[in-house]
Each structure stands twice: as C-alpha cells, then as structure tokens.
Amino acid sequence: MMKFLRGITIKQTLLMASIVIMASCKSTKVVTGGTVDEKLSAKSVIKAHYQNQANFKTLNGKVRVSYSDGESSQNVSVSIRMEKDKAIWMSAPLGIVKAYITPDRVSFYNKLQNEYFDGDFSYLSELLGTEVDFSILQNLLTGQAIVDLRQEKYGIDLFEESYRLTPKLPGTLYKTLFRIEPKNYKMALQQLSQPLKNRLLEISYENYQILNKEILPNEIKIRAITKDNENNIALEFRNIELNGAVNFPYSIPKGFKEIEL
C-alpha cells in the first residue's frame, strides 16, 4: 500500500479521484439478464432510462480500484462518501491521500509528497478528454447518461443484448454512443470520442445490483485514451450504505505546496 501511494503522480491522483467517484455500490444481489424488445423505439428506451434513475440522499462505503497505465499497475482500496448534488469525498488508508469535490471545486492533498491541489474541473476535463463537471460525475456514479439524451434524436438498434443509441446528427467535434441494458434500462456502456484529437473515454458497466430498492452499478471498467496514453481502471464497490448520516472531514494541511497545473 505504501509503495502504491508513493508512486502516485499528480496526474494519477486526479485521474483516480475523478474515476473513483464515477460509480456506485456493492451488495449481495447482482442484477443480470433481461430481454431486449426489438419493437421499442429510441424515445421509449430513453424515457424508461430516466424513469429508472436511482433516488437516494447519501452514500457511504469502500471501493477497490485497479489501475494500469501500460507501464505499471496498482491496486488500492479507498473510502468513499457522497451527498447527492452536493459533495463527494474519498480517502486512502490513514488519510494519506484525500479528495473532496463539490459542484464548483476539485481539491485533494497527498501527505507523502506534501502537496495539494485546489481548483475547478478544467484539468479533469482535459485529462479525460471531455467536459467534466459534478453533474456528469454523479450521472456516471448512478449509471445514468452523462449527456441529456432527451435533447436530441437518436437511432436505435440491438447489440449484444442491449439497446444501442447513436445520434441521428453526429457531432463534429465529439462522437457519442450509448448502450442501455434491457432489465432496468441503465447504462451498459457510454462512449465519447474526439477523433481529431485521438481521444476516447469509454465507461462500461459490468453489472448492476439492488441496494435499498435502488438499482446501482456494481462493477465498472473505464478506458481513458489520448494520443500518447491509455489508462485502464476497474472498480469494485463494497459495503455500501445509502441514506445514512455522512460527514466530509477535509482540511488541507498547513505548509503543503500548492500544485499549479
């Protein structure tokens, strides 16, 4: 664990902080299966997707993160807490690395390197190759589309036992693709790419689970590809509780050097 934490670079810390908060929950009942209906329209599938979004106030638990950048691979378990629409907090063992994210702020510190970062979402957006804000992270957390599918028209076909949605009018800078699983109409895969910049962000939801009657992601895999790098992260969520009391202990230690990006 200490070897892992010493090896964390600024880029890895920000990437892992952003990815760790892009998902949720572990319980004993995993949701699988479902049968696609070839008669459903894109509009009907999108409507069902929004009707089935999770509704909870707080989240508290742990997530096991497996990270690989092509040159090295690491594993770490972190604590995660969330108050919906307000805050996301994570902490490595002994509080050696902590992150605190609100709708207008991204902040973290690393006690091993005596450094901290406190700023907006612009660096995370650049790192992941797409615009990122608190709402997008929260949607990723709950298996919801990271863009509002109701704002444009989509074509639909069936692919690997899921509904595949592609925009009828493809974007010039960004290309998007969504796959929705048929049992609960949650995301099976989200893909955003910038072909001109050789960037790809792909989030695949391995399965879902039921927790307090809510359907939430159980395991997630993320690929973040740029022209020069490929980062792969796998998430497994454990001991998650919903709607309990949570707090977010976070204070940047005095004397730490600010990271300027």
Where are these regions (language model features)?
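Well-ordered beta-strand positions in beta-sheet-rich domains
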Residues: 75-79, 98, 116-118, 177, ...
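Start-of-domain marker
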Residues: 29-105
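Membrane-proximal, glycine/serine-rich, low-complexity loop/turn segments characteristic
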Residues: 26-32, 251, 261
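Bacterial N-terminal signal peptides that target proteins for export
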Residues: 2-14
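Gly/Pro-enriched, hydrophobic low-complexity segments
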Residues: 154-261
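C-terminal motif of bacterial Sec signal peptides marking the signal peptidase cleavage site
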Residues: 21-24
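An acidic-aromatic
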Residues: 87-135
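Hydrophobic, well-structured mid-protein blocks that either form specific transmembrane helices
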Residues: 125-168
